[in-house]
Amino acid sequence: MSDIEQERWSRVKGRLRSTVGEDIYSSWFARMDLESVHGESVRMSVPTRFLKSWIQAHYAERVLACWQAELPDVHRIDLMVRSAMRCAAPAKEAPAADPRRPEHGDGRASTELKMVATAPASANHDALGGSPLDPRLTFASFVTGRSNTLAHAAARQVAEGRRGDSIMFNPLYIHAGVGLGKTHLLQAVTWAGNAGTERKVLYLTAEKFMYGFVAALKSQTALAFKEALRGIDVLVIDDLQFLQGKSTQAEFCHTLNALIDAGRQVVVAADRPPSDLESLDDRVRSRLAGGLVVEMGSLGEELRLGILKSRIEVARAHHASFSVPEPVLDYLAKAITHNGRDLEGAINRLLAHSKLNAQPVTLEMAEREVRDLIRPQEPRRIKIEDIQRVVARQYNVSRSDLLSSRRTANVVRPRQVAMYLAKTLTLRSLPEIGRRFGGRDHTTVLHAVRKIEALVSKDTTLSDEVELLKRQLQE
């Protein structure tokens, strides 16, 4: 860009900022760049499709007016997505504006914001208009095992769907701990879904959703924000546990309902099941639980070994001589049990040490380099449903009895024991425990906890029963 064009662009941006206001400018125009000026046509770019669509729908005439104040002969704006420009073959020059272009009633040329030739959206995450995508996180690089087979199969089915197909799982809700592959699956769905041009698949973190909604509220463009989201064919939301704020949650709930009711697919991931998302509104949890809820469990040794081998193959694509002996692989698979990120980190460390020091990978090197990645085995995470099931079996009652309003002695005591265990073995709050036991008040739970605490200190039989239940739940 020449100095003259740069000066013109600075003046146009100043006019635009004055026209729309600082908040709107910062939200929607701060990342817009000038690419070129050709006669009557100005070519500009934005980083995402979402941003392009928004500007095209709501600010086209204002953008054109700002340019015409600087260059009266400009009658056309070509707005493109930068990532598509980088990935596509060079586009042909924009044709000169048609002198017969349609006019408004006052004789002004109609505003034209046109998207020129672009590559498929899968070419780069920016073209999706959502949160950044890692090009490594595809189905091809996802390693399957017993703990993630169902989640993988469900995600593949979503990704391979076509517009108009009947939807089997909606929403698809995947939950897992940190580093177990849920983000990998969600991004794989997005890459695969956007590989063609038929469907619009948008990947957003909960944080990005919140930011977009709050920015729309501040700029008084909330309606456009809602319309844009509800025009998506597949909405993919990651890290839902971070969704905060009543108004944001309400908007997410409305969006969720609108998309599902319209036959659009929704895929969600979080670090816990819907019932454990205490900060979310009951309506949101209920709608999420109404779809397919899939847990991705901890990585078994065989799966950990598969992940290690996969990461080594990736490393060898750039470092052909890199090799990890089988004894080292076995050691890593047995010793690093926490999550897949630690396994990838271990391979990266061995690669760096081997290449930088020009030494082969040995078991001694591995033991030294990954020492801090070997963590104590975490205790099994206990769920309230597990407690209810084990207690019901122990006392020969049904789980529905524990949740009911029955006050008979053979039900009251097991219910109190289950509430006591829920308080001592989980991180759930008293109100949440009460809700999970038939919608009881938190004072009822507190009474049950104190009652059992007092009894186990005096009643050895009950104390033994409670200890037995704890062992069964922790095994």
From Swiss-Prot:
What are the start and end residues of every segment in region (Domain IV, binds dsDNA)?
Answer: 355-475
Q: Name one Pfam family in it.
A: DnaA_N
Entry-linked SUPFAM superfamilies: P-loop containing nucleoside triphosphate hydrolases, TrpR-like
Pull one GO CC term from this UniProt entry: plasma membrane
Q: Where is this region: Domain I, interacts with DnaA modulators?
A: 1-73
- Region (Domain III, AAA+ region) spans which residues? 132-354
Where it sits in the cell: the answer is:
Cytoplasm
Q: Which InterPro entries match?
A: AAA+_ATPase (IPR003593), Chromosome_initiator_DnaA (IPR001957), Chromosome_initiator_DnaA-like (IPR020591), Chromosome_initiator_DnaA_CS (IPR018312), DnaA_C (IPR013159), DnaA_dom (IPR013317), DnaA_N_dom (IPR024633), DnaA_N_sf (IPR038454)
Claim: ATP-binding is one of the keywords in the record? yes
State the superkingdom. Bacteria
The segments labelled Domain II in the record are 73-131
Query: What keywords is this UniProt entry annotated with?
Result: ATP-binding, Cytoplasm, DNA replication, DNA-binding, Lipid-binding, Nucleotide-binding
Disulphide connectivity of cysteines: none
* Known role: Plays an essential role in the initiation and regulation of chromosomal replication. ATP-DnaA binds to the origin of replication (oriC) to initiate formation of the DNA replication initiation complex once per cell cycle. Binds the DnaA box (a 9 base pair repeat at the origin) and separates the double-stranded (ds)DNA. Forms a right-handed helical filament on oriC DNA; dsDNA binds to the exterior of the filament while single-stranded (ss)DNA is stabiized in the filament's interior.
**Entry remark concerning the domains of this protein:** Domain I is involved in oligomerization and binding regulators, domain II is flexibile and of varying length in different bacteria, domain III forms the AAA+ region, while domain IV binds dsDNA.
NCBIfam families, sorted = DnaA (TIGR00362)
Give the family from UniProt: Belongs to the DnaA family.
Q: What is this protein called?
A: Chromosomal replication initiator protein DnaA
Organism, by scientific name, is Nitrobacter hamburgensis (strain DSM 10229 / NCIMB 13809 / X14)
Lineage, uppermost ranks? Bacteria, Pseudomonadati, Pseudomonadota, Alphaproteobacteria, Hyphomicrobiales
Q: Which gene encodes it?
A: dnaA
